[in-house]
Regions:
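Glycine-rich, positively charged N-terminal anion/phosphate-binding segment
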Residues: 15-19, 24, 33-108
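Conserved, mostly hydrophobic/aromatic
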Residues: 30, 45, 56, 85, ...
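Short glycine-enriched, charge-decorated loop/helix-capping segments at active-site entrances
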Residues: 125-131, 191, 255-257
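Active-site beta-loop-alpha junctions enriched in small/polar residues
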Residues: 33-35, 58-60, 88-90, 115-117, ...
Length: 330
């Protein structure tokens, strides 16, 4: 029966909407990631085909306390819309207040982080830590939805561990709270990022006849081809790409790019980040992407040059290294 459903969904796919935001048919979304999804990177991901992008996730407590570095993460460019801002925290009142602050910069979506597994977040009862306290998680969701008029969405995981796979019931509960879409990462908190993402439960949530909100799948998607297989096999409304985008904004592109072109894209990302901040912060933001970019993987005798590239403190020095890489390898 599900095979027939998959064929039907593949042939008669309709545009995905979050509230009134039309993301088109089978959209790819950029996941919110701390120290990764800065504005320069988001702009490039958008250019290469991301239907929607998200800022770095931000702490509700830091927003309420007006911490300047956190407030800077709320900057949105008109050309990157639709864009979402994701917040995390464990207190309903502060999350609602943070959502009101976020709404003042007019994002298209406010997303609630109930999935981050790292110790500094989940260990304090926020992010995926809330999967151990569903009543509080739902209280936060209702409080935020009641505080803002912007569509509210949620990103979460399958459950805390394999003995507590709660996503099927949780999806219904979150929908009943009034969320506009749900993103599910196909791992538990205990798995962190180990093993492989299990899309089986994501597909079950999507097939649940009670569920009518968009379901976005996330986990181990590294290309458009893999995203297509996820759409075909599990029937999800959208696919979110996270770690595979590090240093690789072209992962959203429909056409294959050459390495020289990819290097030019990284150079543009560097320039955008420097222009929007300053040389020090622009290089710092870009350095993380250079360290992760697949175009530098496996280059022979590149170790010394790589260290120089990641230690460079001047834009011209990094661009000079790019030129050297072009001549030696591409």
């Amino acid at each position: 029966m599900w095979v027939v459903e998959r064929i039907f969904l593949s042939i008669f796919a309709v545009a995905m909407k979050i509230g009134s935001i039309n993301l088109g048919d089978r959209p790819l979304l950029l996941a919110p990631m701390e120290d990764v999804t800065d504005i320069g990177f988001r702009l490039l991901c958008k250019r290469f085909g991301a239907a929607m992008v998200y800022t770095e996730f931000v702490s509700a407590e830091a927003l309420v306390r007006s911490v300047k570095p956190t407030l800077r993460k709320l900057e949105i460019a008109a050309t990157e819309r639709p864009v979402g801002i994701q917040i995390y925290g464990r207190d309903a009142e502060s999350m609602a207040e943070a959502a009101r602050i976020v709404e003042s910069v007019h994002p298209d979506v406010i997303d609630l982080n109930f999935g981050c597994p790292v110790k500094k977040v989940a260990g304090k009862g926020a992010g995926a830590g809330l999967l151990q306290d569903v009543p509080r998680l739902l209280e936060i969701t209702r409080a935020v939805i009641g505080a803002v008029s912007t569509p509210v969405t949620v990103k979460t995981r399958l459950g805390w561990d394999q003995e507590h796979l709660i996503i099927t019931e949780l999806a219904e509960q979150l929908q009943d709270c009034g969320i506009s879409a749900l993103t599910i990462h196909g791992r538990t908190r205990s798995q962190m990022y180990t093993g492989t993402a299990d899309w089986t439960l994501i597909g079950e949530v999507k097939r649940n006849p009670r569920i009518h909100i968009p379901i976005i799948g996330n986990g181990d998607i590294c290309s458009r081809d893999e995203a297509k297989r996820a759409f075909d096999e599990w029937g999800v409304d959208g696919v979110m790409i996270g770690r595979a985008s590090f240093g690789c904004p072209w992962v959203f592109s429909e056409k294959e790019l050459g390495n020289e072109e990819k290097l030019e894209i990284l150079a543009e990302q560097l320039r955008i980040n420097v222009e929007r901040t300053d040389e020090y912060r622009g290089i710092l933001h870009t350095r993380r992407h250079l360290a992760a970019s697949p175009i530098f993987k496996g280059l022979p005798d590149f170790r010394k040059t790589r260290i120089e590239m990641l230690r460079a403190e001047k834009v011209e020095d990094i661009l000079a290294i790019f030129e050297e890489v072009k001549k030696r390898y591409f």
